[in-house]
Curated annotation (Swiss-Prot):
The keyword DNA-binding applies. This is Putative B3 domain-containing protein Os02g0455900. Coiled coil: none annotated. GO terms for cellular component: nucleus. Keywords: DNA-binding, Nucleus, Transcription, Transcription regulation. It comes from the Eukaryota. Disulfide bonds: none annotated. Its main location: nucleus. Gene3D superfamilies: DNA-binding pseudobarrel domain. Residues 189-227 are annotated as: Disordered. It comes from Oryza sativa subsp. japonica. GO terms for molecular function: DNA binding; DNA-binding transcription factor activity. It is found in: Nucleus. The keyword Ribosomal protein does not apply.
């Protein structure tokens, strides 16, 4: 059977297409998936003890003679699609085994997502619906529940059912006429009896800008030099040193001969 076209924007007191069947469903139970529920090694959904009684109402015998017990549910998103899960019990542990792994892989379920079961009292059918969170954790603590992408402290059972995303009654619209383009039907979240709590939006933290260090090199002014002349860094006064006298030995006696001036006269000022 082909799926129905998408729902209109409003369901409660709003517009419903002519080719849709409105099904009133009663919420049975739900579970926040744990890593063991979506593991490819086990491929089983463990049912909590407080919901075992409601699960047994869904269990039917597949084969009367030596058969096994199964749970037949209808997909709440795809019209006319049935899922068959094998019921298995061991050491007071109730779980759904064969068929659950295919459902989890097709829906892309991960730890932290929610799966819920419904019952239609009018037609006697059972439905399964899932809600994938945007941020699913790989592991969740057993003392907390994940609702709308946020981890909260454990609450009393009545409070948990009141805040459950699928608690109370839900309205499901199914398509009756065949359609060329298959589109999954959607639930009317406005008729679930609770408003979807949006997590508080935290403003983004501004990232501090890194300051770039810039180094500017100022060229030194060129030195004014004259071709062929050395550069004088510091001027000093020139002091003339008196000439040194010559010492001559004559007949065993040393005689100091004073230096001569440019005019040929002997100098009186000299260093002996």
């Amino acid at each position: 059977m082909a799926a129905s076209p998408p729902l209109p924007t409003s369901i409660d007191g709003g517009q419903v297409l002519d080719d849709m069947e409105v099904v009133e469903m009663k919420y049975l139970f739900g579970k926040v998936l744990m890593p063991s529920d979506v593991s490819w090694d086990t491929e089983q959904l463990v049912i909590p003890d407080e919901h075992v009684g409601k699960l047994l109402d869904m269990v039917v015998m597949n084969r009367p003679e030596g058969g096994f017990f199964v749970v037949v549910v209808e997909d709440g998103e795809v019209t006319g699609k049935l899922w068959l899960f094998r019921y298995w019990k061991r050491d007071d542990v109730h779980c759904l085994t064969k068929g659950w792994g295919c459902y989890a892989r097709e829906k892309g379920l991960r730890a932290g997502d929610t799966v819920s079961f419904f019952h239609s009292t009018a037609c006697g059918r059972f439905f399964i619906c899932c809600r994938c969170t945007c941020m699913s954790f790989l592991s969740l603590p057993t003392t907390s529940h994940r609702i709308h992408g946020s981890s909260v402290l454990p609450q009393p059972r009545a409070a948990q059912e009141a805040h459950h995303p699928f608690s109370g009654h839900a309205t499901l619209c199914l398509g009756n006429k065949a359609s060329d383009h298959s589109a999954p039907a959607r639930h009317a979240t406005a008729s679930l009896g609770c408003a979807a709590a949006q997590p508080p939006q935290v403003p983004p933290t501004p990232t501090p800008r890194r300051r770039r260090r810039s180094m500017m090199v100022h060229p030194e002014p060129p030195e004014h030099t004259t071709d062929g002349m050395p550069v004088i860094l510091e001027s000093m006064a020139l002091v003339s040193t008196p000439p040194v006298a010559k010492r001559v030995r004559l007949f065993g006696v040393y005689i100091d001969v004073p230096p001569l001036r440019p005019g040929g006269e002997a100098t009186q000022d000299f260093n002996p």
